Amino acid sequence: YLRSNLMSSLIDTYIFNLQQNNILNSYFEINTVFNSSPDNTFNDVPNQNVVLGFITSANLTTQDIRKSDQNIDIYYVKSLINQLINDTQLEPIIKPGFHQNYSFSIFKNNEIVGHFGQLSTELQNNFEIENEVFLGEIYVNKLNLNELKLINYKPLSQYPFIKFDLSFSVPVEFSAHL
């Protein structure tokens, strides 16, 4: 089927992982979405756009027991978008599925390049989600990829993180009865 947005599948992914007690609760997807306007090249084909979709909880948890959970708000999400895309402007929007006071269109050079916001309270209650959820889409086709900020990637350690390292001193005379 042809998807018109990534948000519905991201919400499904978020809920599935929530039900599986997966504590990592930020997800993204880059994929093609379609709309009913005609394609620029072929008139009989729906318009296709490459979209970056994201979803995150207001309560970010970590598997690293040395760090505490982080509570975020809509302004933190806005700052992440600004870190990725230079010189964006935001305008409030009213969009189905989004909280009416916390949803925004993202503009760059007076052109809409995406939208984001908080999941509506009604949907949050319907899906039985306790924490606030922020989600959005960025239209990659509408961005000049050469203007994106370069973010240095730090590779993950090749050694797995160890939660506990336990050592025991056992007397020599200790015997295990098998």
Give the residues covered by each predicted segment:
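Extended beta-strand-rich architecture
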Residues: 1-178
